Amino acid sequence: MSLLTEVETPIRNEWGCRCNDSSDPLVVAASIIGIVHLILWIIDRLFSKSIYRIFKHGLKRGPSTEGVPESMREEYREEQQNAVDADDGHFVSIELE
């Protein structure tokens, strides 16, 4: 008994494939899974950077400010800007002797 399910045999002067189990539900399911896997792999290769960025950071661009008074929003913006401004003056000077 052979473990092969497909046998290549000469049919009418051509090489063909005699697949008797092609209507088996397991073969159909495996074919569908293979096709879906191939499609998902292609999509992943084409759009990997944008897909992983969405998973990492979500669809939001920043912290939610819903329900926060405008004065607190402005204070938060000033704190963020001051933190950026403070970092601008910190440079390390290294001298080699």
Curated annotation (Swiss-Prot):
Keywords, comma-separated and alphabetical: Disulfide bond, Glycoprotein, Host cell membrane, Host membrane, Host-virus interaction, Hydrogen ion transport, Inhibition of host autophagy by virus, Ion channel, Ion transport, Lipoprotein, Membrane, Palmitate, Phosphoprotein, Signal-anchor, Transmembrane, Transmembrane helix, Transport, Viral ion channel, Virion
Site (Seems to be involved in pH gating): 41
GO CC entries: host cell plasma membrane; membrane; virion membrane
The keyword Transmembrane helix appears for this protein: yes
Residues carrying a glycan: 20
Record text on activity regulation: The M2 protein from most influenza A strains is inhibited by amantadine and rimantadine, resulting in viral uncoating incapacity. Emergence of amantadine-resistant variants is usually rapid.
GO biological process: protein complex oligomerization; symbiont genome entry into host cell via pore formation in plasma membrane; symbiont-mediated suppression of host autophagy
Membrane-spanning parts: 23-43
Intravirion side: 44-97
UniProt keyword Hydrolase present: no
Membrane topology listed for this record: Single-pass type III membrane protein
GO molecular function list: monoatomic ion channel activity; proton transmembrane transporter activity
Biased composition (Basic and acidic residues): 71-80
Cellular compartment(s): Virion membrane; Host apical cell membrane
UniProt superkingdom: Viruses
Segments of this protein annotated with the region Disordered: 60-88
Virion surface topology ranges: 1-22
Main location: virion
Annotated site residues (Essential for channel activity, possibly by being protonated during channel activation, and by forming the channel gate and the selective filter) in this chain: 37
Task performed by this protein: Forms a proton-selective ion channel that is necessary for the efficient release of the viral genome during virus entry. After attaching to the cell surface, the virion enters the cell by endocytosis. Acidification of the endosome triggers M2 ion channel activity.
HAMAP family: INFV_M2 (MF_04069)
The record's note on its domains: Cytoplasmic tail plays an important role in virion assembly and morphogenesis.
Assigned protein family: Belongs to the influenza viruses matrix protein M2 family.
Other comments on record: When the channel is activated, one or more imidazole moieties of His-37 probably become bi-protonated.
Subunit text: Homotetramer; composed of two disulfide-linked dimers held together by non-covalent interactions. May interact with matrix protein 1.
Protein name: Matrix protein 2
Organism: Influenza A virus (strain A/China:Nanchang/11/1996 H1N1)
The gene coding this protein: M
